[in-house]
Swiss-Prot record:
It catalyses: ATP + H2O + 4 H(+)(in) = ADP + phosphate + 5 H(+)(out). The gene is atpA. It comes from Orientia tsutsugamushi (strain Ikeda) (Rickettsia tsutsugamushi). Its EC number is 7.1.2.2. It is found in: Cell inner membrane. The record marks 370 as: Required for activity. Keywords: ATP synthesis, ATP-binding, Cell inner membrane, Cell membrane, CF(1), Hydrogen ion transport, Ion transport, Membrane, Nucleotide-binding, Translocase, Transport. One of its GO terms (molecular function) is ADP binding. Produces ATP from ADP in the presence of a proton gradient across the membrane. The alpha chain is a regulatory subunit. ATP binds at residues 169-176. This is ATP synthase subunit alpha. Belongs to the ATPase alpha/beta chains family.
Amino acid sequence: MQLKASEVYEALKKQLEDFDELSELSEVGYVISIGDGIAKVYGLSNAYSGEILQFSTGTKGIVFSLKDNLIEAVVIGSDDQIKQGSQVKRTQTSLKVPTGKELLGRVVDAVGNPIDGKGEFINPTYLDVEVKAPSVMCRDSVNEPMYTGIKAIDALIPIGKGQRELIIGDRQTGKTAIAIDIILNQKRFHLSDQEREKVYCIYVAIGQKRSTVAQLVKKLQETGAMAYTTVVLSSASDAASLQYLAPYTGCAIGEYFRDNGMHALVIYDDLSKHAIAYRQISLLLRRPPAREAYPGDVFYLHSRLLERAAKLNKAKGEGSLTALPIVETQNSDVSAYIPTNIISITDGQIFLESELFYKGTKPALNVGISVSRVGAAAQIKAMKDIAGTVKLELAQYHEMEAFSQFGADLDSSSMQLINRGRRLSELLKQSQYCPFSVEEQIIVLFAGINGYLDKVAVSKVKEFESNMLEHFRIHNPDIMNEIISTKKITEIISSKLHQILQEFVKSIEQYS
């Protein structure tokens, strides 16, 4: 019997119509062993390093090691539900996290999921957690100031937008307090209509207590700073994998603003705990330990994170991402492995000393070994001129004070230098949650270096400073606006400042 072509065609057509198309084609592997957040998986020979795997329980993992017929994946979160023999699928994607202005005012976990009970994000932009840092040709020099509101930093250790500045010191020396004050200081720029002046903040808490972070978030909400801030939390009770991912997630959130022509500030608190989490993962993966049991690539761990902070050029939108990593030292030992690594990666460090902190100097900055390698280029001329004199007078004061310890008789000029140095040191002290605008800082330091506090008792310096600024705000706001608009102290501004300060000092008896 001979079949007609039309009959064959109709039969094939009917069969194809009844054919169920596979909804999904995926590579599947199986868990050989699971423990301590590390899964050994067989059967996914085409997986690549950094790829996201999907376990049958719904949990996700990241490929960390590739071996013959075997891969090792780090489970993101808890591995309680994963058993030996569980099915694992490739996703053929790397980890992406939600970013955008929708995240402002929110608290998210290490992979960007909201944990503040305010609901899911509606339309976020998803970005890769691990990306290459901008190339040299995409960058511009650091030329815009990042105002911290802290006199000692803005004058002596200035930070620019796009800089990486390390905050380093022993526990309980005020490292987080400085970071929070910097976030609070950005509020004054968000109250203005100039979008270019606004700085969006990302605070990454690594290995901290949830109660501590809750207090911090409450403070940001009370001051109105949460409106332009995102908090990324990976608490001490979270898995090492989440503590490892948190800084990269925070960086990706900041990169959204940087790449869209805006300014962002990301604070990593702190990278010591981040390194410890990575050390734990590496030892569980049986990677060979090096100095202090850290793996050999711990430098790359932090360099690839911090190199993503950048000031982009005009062609790329002139956005910036400023990074403030925090590192905790043991007994002020800055020569330990992680501190020296991060010091060599960053553009300077703010060193906090426990001795100064216990003496009541807050912020407890050691001006001698704190440095900013690129921020001075971003300082406005008015601050640069005053800061130079402040640095010189403080250096002379510390040298002369050390000399006076020997009980030597000092002449009148040396005594005057010591007296002024003491008052300048007192001026640089600052209470927490009290940021100063740049024009206020310039006026305060101008008064200090020109001898207007020489007759003020050291114990009354803070009171004098407060009343002087109040006098300027009420009676001379025009001079403050003039300093900001011109960005330098002209002869006219200088003579006006001298005149106002001379009149104010006539009532000095109450402070002497």
